[in-house]
Amino acid sequence: MPKGYLVANLRVKDPEAFKKFSEAALPSIEQYGGRILARGPHADRHEGNVSGVVTMLEFESKEAAEKFYFSDEYQAAKAIRDTGCDADLMIIEGIQE
């Protein structure tokens, strides 16, 4: 089964809220079997308008990533995130190997 990936671009408006979001989100990422593949504000942009903190999470499947995203635990963290960040977020299915 192909892996699932959550890719987010977060434009931080309130660093303290972003810190609280990060602390709240990590346990739910782990609880739903996710792992952080990449995260950081220092992405080299070569095309488009991406700016901010880019994060990529890996899950066992696209369905597992969606289960994480819609979980009560993550939605509570997201409520914190929404107070201090603008976000673009997508969940995609990996390639079957």
PLM regions: where:
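Short S/T/G/P-rich N-terminal loop/turn motif that feeds into the first structured element of a domain
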Residues: M1-V53, E60-F70, E93-E97
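C-terminal structural segments of small proteins and small subunits
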Residues: K62, E66-M90
